[in-house]
From Swiss-Prot:
Record GO biological process: tRNA methylation; tRNA wobble uridine modification
Domain TrmE-type G, first and last residues per copy: 218-381
Binding site for (6S)-5-formyl-5,6,7,8-tetrahydrofolate: R24, E81, K121, K457
PROSITE patterns in alphabetical order: G_TRME
Species annotation: Nitrobacter hamburgensis (strain DSM 10229 / NCIMB 13809 / X14)
Subunit structure of this chain's protein: Homodimer. Heterotetramer of two MnmE and two MnmG subunits.
Entry binding sites for GTP: 228-233, 247-253, 272-275
The EC number(s) this enzyme carries: 3.6.-.-
Cofactor(s) needed by this chain: K(+)
Protein name per Swiss-Prot or TrEMBL: tRNA modification GTPase MnmE
InterPro entries, sorted: G_TrmE, GTP-bd, GTP-bd_TrmE_N, GTPase_MnmE, MnmE_dom2, MnmE_helical, P-loop_NTPase, Small_GTP-bd
Protein's gene: mnmE
Taxonomic placement: Bacteria, Pseudomonadati, Pseudomonadota, Alphaproteobacteria, Hyphomicrobiales
Cited NCBIfam families: mnmE_trmE_thdF, PRK05291.1-3, small_GTP
């Protein structure tokens, strides 16, 4: 029997131990599993309390069972659910009983969702939305993923595809029956008007979703600077926990430390890097190299100033175009909080150039950190752009729709040069949008997507 024809089961709730655990079974033998273990199949969509027994008649647990007859189920197949007490012993006994039934096996990661997709219960964009929802860290990410799961992009793409097929049919009819006089001479005009409108809609969707993938992937902020400038202290202050070791000795941080923050709903990865300086220590040299690389690839760099070190940021991380803020730390020690320090004085240091933002803080005491966080939040508002309300949430979506819009534009440009050429470009656009929805040529995408799901989903 092919694996996709076998019945699958998995824990669909949290890790044990727990008060309640939900074990889901999907496939042709789901009803058999209920009969063998629960004694009977309950009324559809009705919870029933039963004593579960293994195939030798030994009691497993006092539990609740439910039955969802396919295709009116989450996967489109027959589905059974066992709601048991969430101890490892109970679950192991239930798993052993299920495994002893012919053609029933443990599920692979994402296999329930893959079966739902293959049975037409969800499209590929909705499956991607579910993946994003499972991995959402912030409320803004959750809301974006939920809209995707509810079909925001899928519904729009299906309508585009339907209208393109209608327009293509008109043009194909004009090609097939032009010599028979069955089709009006102006058949091409309404079809191409529809094509032009759909192209504009796709382009407007792309424009309205500019940089929308950013909310899903998050922003990276690197804390860089010379040794002992207080980078780890600032990381801990922003993370509100002891994520990095703090020491008065220079060179304590030798590797890159990452902390994930929820900044007013925006996902931000904060990176603490090794102090950048010239050193003969090979381990510290590797840390400095990694620090430079991560700072150069970050979306924003916070450079902690050190008045005792003349090394400027442009001398250490290069001119990569990464936004850079200068943060003067240890104002409680240097006296900058009361000496009336002029921000322009800092801009004039050799090799530093004109820097857009300056902040004076004490990472150890917290002075000025609230202002820095407020500035980071404001920066995030602009950096994430339309991500929260975007229709497009993945680079895959963007690439496909850009190609579809290009094909439609090419179809418009080919008017008068042969209806066959126009029709072919429209067919390409139809196939592309079908690929967006998961209708054609997407096995490689499915394997990658569902591999990232947890077992039981």
């Amino acid at each position: 029997m092919h694996p996709r024809e076998q019945t699958i089961f998995a824990l669909s709730s949290g890790r044990p131990p727990s008060a309640i655990a939900v074990v889901r079974v999907s496939g042709a033998e789901a009803g058999t599993a209920l009969q063998e273990i629960a004694g009977a199949i309950p009324v559809v969509r009705t919870a029933k309390r039963v004593l579960l027994r293994d195939l030798l008649g030994e009691a497993i647990d006092d539990a609740i069972v439910l039955w969802f007859a396919g295709p009116a189920s989450a996967t489109g197949e027959d589905v059974a659910e066992f709601h048991v007490h969430g101890s490892r012993a109970v679950l192991n006994a239930l798993f052993a009983a299920l495994s002893s039934i012919d053609h029933v096996r443990p599920a692979e990661p994402g296999e329930f969702t893959r079966r739902a997709f293959e049975n037409g219960k969800i499209d590929l964009t909705e499956a991607e939305g579910l993946d994003d929802l499972i991995h959402a860290d912030t409320d803004r990410q959750r809301r974006q993923a939920l809209r995707q799961l509810q079909g925001l992009l899928g519904d729009r793409a299906r309508e585009w595809r339907r209208e393109l097929i209608e327009a293509s049919a008109l043009i194909e009819a004009g090609i097939d029956f032009a010599d028979e006089g069955d089709v009006p001479d102006d058949l091409l005009k309404p079809a191409m008007e529809k094509i032009a409108r759909l192209r504009r809609e796709i382009e407007e969707t792309l424009a309205a979703s500019a940089q929308s993938e950013r909310l899903r992937d998050g922003m990276t902020v690197a804390i860089a600077g010379p040794p002992n400038a207080g980078k780890s202290t600032l990381l801990n202050r922003l993370a509100r926990r002891e994520a990095a070791i703090v020491s008065p000795y220079a060179g304590t941080t030798r590797d890159v430390i990452e902390v994930h923050l929820d900044l007013d709903g925006y996902p931000v990865t904060l990176i603490d890097t090794a102090g950048i300086r010239e050193t003969d220590d090979p381990v510290e040299q590797e840390g400095v190299r990694r620090a430079r690389d991560r700072a150069a690839s970050a979306d924003l760099v916070l450079w902690l100033a050190d008045d005792d070190n003349g090394v400027g940021p442009s001398q250490t991380i290069g001119e990569g175009g990464v936004p850079l803020w200068l943060v003067r730390n240890k104002i409680d020690v240097s006296g900058a909080e009361s000496d009336g320090a002029n921000p322009r004085q800092l801009e004039a240091k050799p090799g530093q150039g004109i820097l857009p933002r300056h902040f004076w803080i004490s990472a150890s005491r917290g002075d000025g950190v609230d202002e820095l966080v407020a500035a980071l939040t404001a920066f995030s508002d602009g950096w994430f752009g339309s991500g929260e309300t975007a229709v497009i949430t993945r680079l895959r979506h963007r690439n496909i729709l850009q190609d579809a819009a290009a094909s439609l534009a090419k179809a418009e440009a080919l008017i008068g040069q042969g209806d066959e050429l126009v029709a072919e470009e429209i067919r390409i656009a139809v196939r592309l949008i079908g690929r967006l929805l998961g209708r054609v040529d997407i096995d490689d995408i499915l394997d990658s997507l569902f591999h990232d799901f947890c077992i039981g989903k």
